[in-house]
């Protein structure tokens, strides 16, 4: 494998035995692709905005004289970039302009000649844009729109599994679900009649729908039944015989023909009998007259002389009726063929309970059901039924729905109309009856072939369409008002409903969520999440076990591990690593194609529907060098996802990778295969809660997924083009681009500005640190700067800690952990949290609020940290209660006492008509002010601080642009210099000239002269571009801010809080092994080994066996080996040993085991080997991919190479006594995470605070500064102790006895410590409640 310069800095040794066939795809594809399809820079009419416009336009007026046509749309460029939108609290969006054409026709002309055409561009609101990382910035906060897993449109056949009726009879039903429009259900009742429901309303006999479709009784019977014809001949009754239909029946009479008895009466008819009948070509057989009694006529029989119907279709035939028919001259009688086994008389029975008799009566019945209480007219009834399923405006199956519909009914063609046809409805009823007759099976709703993904783009399109429909109504009204001479398209369209619909979706839809920004992994996972909840989905309460369960079709599509614990379990899932959606929105996963037992290079993506037909081998099946299966029988998933053994030649496909089953978070757990699934679930979920530490530390034991996650999350800075680092500091990196990657005529310089100390959604700190040095070569796509929780471009959520599994004085009882003080001293788990506090000055009725340092009744000390504008200065250390922004609010005038009047007259007005409403630091918070931002409304005068900030921003912007210009100019002049030197000038001549004069020289060579002129033009362009950019920046900085109505000024203060680890903080490993820190122990008391090296954390060994997450033990052993090798390398470097020896040792470590990725150090230079060695000193990073990890013998060999005991256990000594512990202890390195459940955020104690209005009891919860509930069990405890007075105090003065509270306060102030309890308010509440029931209740106080 060839490594680039940066990759050679640190190479992770992989134990994976299977070669990587397919690279991990870009992890945010699902979001970006979906939104691209919605926006469509080059539109096609099938989807996105274009489709929405085309489905609504043209809008035609009611009289048909004018129409508004759609031509095209154009998206503008956003005014502010993403960063600016976040700071200003605005939405990152682009304006949508649509070209419309208003065409009016001549009324009189029958042909409808065009009278007038007006074309115009119309503004249609703002469309939020997706950032390059798959998020949206809405009102300044980053949000993610989660994809939804919903039931695919189409037709579904299901049964109630015998739960509806007491007899346990299975009732079948069919449901046609469109993409939008009314649902149509067909269902059997316990009496086997077929009913239909529209939109889950009252049921009607299903035949009403058929009659409404203009079918007669005869035609209906024709559609659903085979016929049996009887012939009356010489007073005998002959039946036409179809032998196959007799199978399984019992003969009710002797079946004979030509004097031969084929089947005796009472015998069961078998295949042998049928063969004999077919062999002798028997087509008619005589039957007794009684046989026809009870059969049902298949058509109307009319008396030809009178025209009277003797026997209507669907009537049971009796002997009298037979006589009548015979007399009327009918020789042939057709009846319906039914039997009890597999041809039920369902439709015939249903027709009998059907109240309708023709099309109109059926339409009226449907109208009455849909619109009860309204008088039906023919037109209304017809219009309603037509609009239900046959109008493309009201009903749409969509391409997916049509495809699923046709496939379900076995129709080859998967395309067709979006509305239903007569045939569609009849076919659905036919298939439902077939299923009831025992042919065919019901669908599995939880199969991923029946559930599809609806992503951002599609949901945004639907919302946009809803907005357009609202506009359409308004436009239609406007068009029918007449007076269209002066009207332009702009006058007709109001953009408000459109932008409101879109805004509502992005701002408050259940699926548009506040992005989880704890760390890069949580961002990536959030964007790859799939929810079954949300509009048009399930609800938590209604979802049963089946929906939440893991399904066979989840394999390689949805992760079986990662899902929340709690009420949402199984409803919110995560996409598997390699999964993607196809054009229809179904999830697909890749497989390697197998031909005749040999695996090919070809990779195919299969959806759940297609996969069911094939036999698929697992990724860890054994292959030889020619990619043939070596085993005689291979474990595979066969049809319907059942596992079994198959011969190699029967196999069609093979998995791509061992980690294709799991999601990104689960693929980051090493030795996942050794963990119980429940614990793995916790491990996957807890990695997302890890807080980025001060210094990121790559995991020693990883899985190889760390790099793709860090790269795709977008938190790190990635090189757009290859080149050389020309300049680097903490806030910017400049790259001189390689010649072959530059576009002709550009300066070839890329500048990357880094994000410094900004706040994330979860109040963690986002900071980028360069990881390249001056002069280093870099390639396109390589990491230039690490973001939060990334280390040299690898995900690093926690720290590698030296752990020991042993009890220690009960300090690790029940999952608690003992942590060494050294961990705190070295700041291993110190995290920075940034809080944003804002102060808003509003315009009130009594006057406007003012931000000032002149605050009434506040001492000097409290104002010491404010500047003259009343705003805290940057760098101030503040604690709870300190003033950050001074603000006063006008008070209403009150009646003044004479004394006050006198004071007013002497000391002037101002003092008392304002009250202090300053922004203070919340209790329990302390930190350093790192940034202040002031936003001022247009037209309001800016204060001194705002002007200072503005000036600073201008300076910074100018400095950035000037530096950028200098770098670009330097690059340009370097090329000019080379050109001039090659064109006959020498260094001395050039030194005497000013740089700008170089461009004015003339060269003999015409080609070079042209190049020089081009460069001169570029120089001018650069200058102009610089001026233009500076002007734009300046106008952006100076312009007033767009604030909410009534707001004059907003001041935002950012506090940075540094949190060290302390008892009560929650920590966890990656295997679901979580715990709370019980004690920070002095380093000298920690257990230590023979070399005097103490452990960092002591974990309880009892936490392992019952939880069955053995992965943590293997990780600990492997971590020890990795560290051991690092120590050996470190010793060699310290002893200044020969580079070749060092190279040999490192090569030996990389070669150990039978991993498929080999590292060849012979191609490295000595300098590269040394740099690699220096980076390996703290431990050699290892990768053990999921389900393809390190084996026990490899771990032992690695331990041996590191000079460590192969048992992984070490003799430890007690730090307090120096005595040896009685047996060796498992010691090693485990990757530990600090989770975002910090004791500082949870610790809370109430003093005097707010009370609930009705009950007058203290509120609950930290946010409300509430108390702890003294519930009934606590009351029992005090009762049991007999502590009557304590109990009385708890239930009265400490809770809701209002008078008692005030008396208590008086007593305490007065120095008498006694208590006078009164009546608790909750007692009054219950009295009032009883009175509200009409019962008079009084308290007799004796």
Swiss-Prot record:
Group of enzyme by EC: transferase
GO molecular function: DNA binding; DNA-directed RNA polymerase activity; ribonucleoside binding
SUPFAM superfamilies per the UniProt record, alphabetical: beta and beta-prime subunits of DNA dependent RNA-polymerase
EC number: 2.7.7.6
A single BP term in Gene Ontology: DNA-templated transcription
Highest taxon above the source species: Bacteria
UniProt KW keywords: DNA-directed RNA polymerase, Nucleotidyltransferase, Transcription, Transferase
Catalysed conversion reaction: RNA(n) + a ribonucleoside 5'-triphosphate = RNA(n+1) + diphosphate
Keyword presence, Transcription: yes
Coiled coil: none
Cysteines paired by S-S bonds: none
PROSITE patterns in alphabetical order: RNA_POL_BETA
UniProt KW Transferase keyword: yes
GO cellular component: DNA-directed RNA polymerase complex
Subunit structure: The RNAP catalytic core consists of 2 alpha, 1 beta, 1 beta' and 1 omega subunit. When a sigma factor is associated with the core the holoenzyme is formed, which can initiate transcription.
Entry similarity comment: Belongs to the RNA polymerase beta chain family.
Role: DNA-dependent RNA polymerase catalyzes the transcription of DNA into RNA using the four ribonucleoside triphosphates as substrates.
Protein known as: DNA-directed RNA polymerase subunit beta
Organism: Histophilus somni (strain 2336) (Haemophilus somnus)
């Amino acid at each position: 494998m060839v490594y680039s310069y940066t990759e050679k800095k640190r190479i992770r040794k992989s134990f994976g035995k299977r070669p990587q066939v397919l690279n991990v795809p870009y992890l945010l594809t699902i979001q970006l692709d979906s939104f691209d399809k919605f926006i469509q820079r080059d539109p096609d009419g099938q989807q996105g905005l274009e489709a929405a416009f085309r489905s609504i336009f043209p809008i035609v007026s009611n009289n048909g004289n004018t129409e508004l046509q759609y031509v095209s749309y154009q998206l503008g460029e956003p005014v502010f970039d993403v960063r600016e939108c976040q700071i200003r609290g605005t939405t990152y969006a682009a304006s949508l302009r649509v070209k419309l054409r208003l065409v009016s026709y001549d009324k009189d002309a029958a042909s409808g000649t065009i009278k007038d055409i007006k074309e115009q561009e119309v503004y249609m609101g703002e469309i939020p844009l997706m950032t390059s990382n798959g998020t949206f910035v809405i009102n300044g906060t980053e949000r993610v729109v989660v994809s939804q897993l919903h039931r695919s449109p189409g037709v579904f056949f299901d049964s109630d599994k015998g739960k509806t009726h007491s007899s346990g009879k299975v009732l079948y039903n069919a449901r046609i679900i469109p993409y939008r429009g009314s649902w149509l259900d067909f269902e059997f009742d316990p009496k086997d009649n077929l009913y239909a429901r529209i939109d889950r309303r009252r049921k009607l006999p299903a035949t009403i729908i058929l009659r409404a479709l203009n079918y007669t009784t005869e035609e209906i019977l024709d559609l659903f039944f085979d016929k049996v014809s009887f012939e009356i001949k010489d007073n005998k009754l002959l039946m036409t015989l179809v032998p196959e239909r007799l199978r399984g029946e019992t003969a009710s009479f002797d079946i004979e023909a030509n004097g031969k008895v084929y089947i005796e009466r009472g015998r069961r008819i078998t295949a042998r009998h049928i063969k004999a009948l077919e062999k002798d070509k028997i087509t008619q057989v005589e039957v007794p007259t009684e046989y026809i009694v009870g059969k049902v006529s298949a058509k109307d029989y009319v008396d030809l002389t009178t025209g009277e119907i003797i026997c209507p279709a669907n009537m049971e035939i009796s002997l009298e009726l037979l006589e009548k028919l015979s007399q009327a001259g009918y020789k042939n009688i057709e009846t319906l063929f039914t039997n009890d086994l597999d041809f039920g008389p369902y439709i015939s029975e249903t027709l009998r309970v059907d109240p309708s008799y023709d099309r109109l009566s059926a339409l009226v019945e449907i109208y009455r059901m849909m619109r009860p209480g309204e008088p039906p007219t023919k037109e209304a009834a017809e219009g309603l039924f037509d609009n239900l399923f046959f109008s493309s405006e009201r009903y749409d199956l969509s391409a997916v729905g049509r495809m699923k519909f046709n496939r379900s009914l076995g129709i080859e063609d998967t395309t067709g109309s979006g509305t239903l046809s007569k045939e569609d409805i009849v076919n659905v009823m036919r298939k439902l009856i077939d299923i009831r007759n025992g042919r065919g099976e019901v669908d599995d709703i939880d199969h991923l072939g029946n559930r599809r993904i609806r992503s951002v783009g599609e949901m945004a399109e639907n919302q946009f369409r809803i907005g357009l429909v609202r506009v359409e109504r308004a436009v239609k009204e406007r068009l029918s008002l007449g007076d269209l001479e002066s009207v332009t398209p702009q006058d007709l369209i109001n953009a408000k409903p459109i932008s409101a619909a879109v805004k509502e979706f992005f701002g408050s839809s259940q699926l548009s969520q506040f992005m989880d920004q704890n760390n890069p992994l949580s961002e990536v996972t959030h964007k790859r999440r799939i929810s079954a909840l949300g509009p048009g989905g399930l609800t938590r309460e209604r979802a049963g076990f089946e929906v939440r369960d893991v399904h066979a079709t989840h394999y390689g599509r949805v992760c079986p591990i990662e899902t929340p614990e709690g009420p949402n379990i199984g409803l919110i899932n995560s996409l598997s690593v390699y999964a993607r959606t196809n054009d229809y929105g179904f999830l697909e996963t890749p497989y390697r194609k197998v031909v005749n037992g040999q695996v090919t290079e070809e990779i195919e993506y299969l959806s759940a529907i297609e996969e069911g037909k094939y036999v698929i081998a697992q990724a860890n099946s054994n292959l030889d060098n020619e990619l043939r299966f070596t085993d005689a029988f291979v474990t595979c998933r066969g049809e319907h996802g059942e596992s079994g053994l198959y011969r190699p030649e029967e196999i069609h496909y093979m998995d791509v990778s061992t980690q294709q089953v799991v999601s990104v978070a689960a693929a980051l757990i090493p030795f996942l295969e050794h963990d119980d699934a429940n614990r793995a679930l916790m491990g996957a979920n807890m990695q997302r809660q890890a807080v980025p530490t001060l210094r990121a530390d790559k995991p020693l034991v990883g899985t190889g997924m760390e790099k793709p996650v860090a790269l795709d999350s977008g938190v790190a800075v990635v090189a757009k083009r290859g080149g050389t680092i020309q300049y680097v500091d903490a806030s910017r990196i400049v790259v001189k681009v390689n010649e072959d990657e530059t576009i002709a005529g550009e300066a070839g310089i890329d500048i990357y500005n880094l994000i410094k100390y900004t706040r994330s959604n979860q109040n963690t700190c986002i900071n980028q640190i360069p990881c390249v040095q001056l002069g280093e070569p870099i390639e396109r796509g390589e990491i230039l700067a690490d973001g939060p929780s990334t280390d040299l471009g690898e995900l690093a959520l926690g720290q590698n800690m030296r752990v020991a599994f042993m009890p220690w004085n009960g300090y690790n009882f029940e999952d608690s952990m003992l942590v060494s003080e050294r961990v705190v001293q070295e700041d291993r788990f110190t995290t920075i949290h940034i809080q944003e506090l804002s102060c808003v000055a509003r315009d009130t009725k009594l006057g406007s609020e003012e931000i000032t340092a002149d605050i009434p009744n506040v001492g000097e000390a409290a104002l010491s940290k404010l500047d003259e504008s009343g705003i805290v200065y940057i760098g101030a250390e503040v604690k709870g209660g300190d003033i950050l922004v001074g603000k006063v609010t006008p008070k209403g005038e009150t009646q003044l006492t004479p004394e006050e009047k006198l004071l007013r007259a002497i000391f002037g007005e101002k003092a008392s008509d304002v009250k202090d409403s300053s922004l203070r630091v919340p209790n329990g918070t302390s930190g350093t002010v790192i940034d202040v931002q002031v936003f001022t409304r247009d037209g309001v005068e800016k204060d001194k601080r705002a002007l200072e900030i503005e000036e600073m921003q201008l300076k910074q912007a100018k400095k950035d642009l000037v530096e950028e210009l200098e770098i670009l100019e330097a690059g340009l002049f370097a090329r000019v210099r080379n050109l001039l030197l090659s064109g006959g000038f020498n260094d001395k001549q050039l030194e005497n000239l000013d740089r700008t004069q170089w461009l004015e020289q003339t060269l003999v060579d015409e080609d070079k002269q042209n190049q020089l002129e081009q460069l001169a033009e570029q120089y001018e362009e650069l200058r102009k571009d610089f001026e233009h950019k500076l002007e734009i920046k300046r106008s952006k900085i100076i312009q007033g801010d767009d604030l909410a109505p009534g707001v004059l000024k907003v001041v935002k203060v950012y506090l940075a809080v540094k949190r060290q680890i302390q008892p009560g903080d929650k920590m966890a490993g990656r295997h679901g092994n979580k715990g709370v820190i019980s004690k920070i122990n002095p380093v000298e008391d920690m257990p230590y080994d023979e070399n005097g090296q103490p452990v960092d954390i002591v974990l309880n060994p009892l936490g392992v066996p019952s939880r069955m997450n053995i992965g943590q033990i293997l990780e600990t052993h492997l971590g020890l080996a990795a560290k051991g090798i690092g120590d050996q390398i470190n010793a060699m470097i310290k002893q200044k040993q020969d580079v070749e020896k060092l190279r040999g040792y490192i090569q030996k470590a990389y070669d150990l085991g039978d991993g498929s990725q080999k590292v060849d150090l012979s191609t490295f230079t000595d300098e590269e080997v040394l740099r690699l060695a220096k980076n390996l000193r703290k431990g050699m990073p290892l990768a053990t991919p999921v389900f393809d990890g390190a084996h026990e013998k490899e771990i032992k060999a690695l331990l041996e190479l590191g000079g460590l005991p192969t048992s992984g256990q070490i003799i430890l000594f007690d730090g307090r006594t120096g005595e040896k512990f009685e047996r060796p202890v498992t010691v090693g390195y485990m990757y530990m995470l600090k989770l975002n459940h910090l004791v500082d955020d949870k610790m809370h104690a109430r003093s005097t605070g707010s009370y609930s209005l009705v009950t007058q009891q203290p509120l609950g919860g930290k946010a409300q500064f509430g108390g702890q509930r003294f519930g009934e069990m606590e009351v029992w405890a005090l009762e049991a102790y007999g502590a009557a007075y304590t109990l009385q105090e708890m239930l009265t003065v400490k809770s809701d006895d209002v008078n008692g509270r005030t008396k208590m306060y008086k007593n305490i102030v007065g120095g008498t410590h006694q208590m006078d309890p009164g009546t608790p308010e909750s007692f009054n509440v219950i009295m009032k409640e009883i009175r509200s029931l009409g019962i008079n209740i009084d308290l007799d106080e004796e």
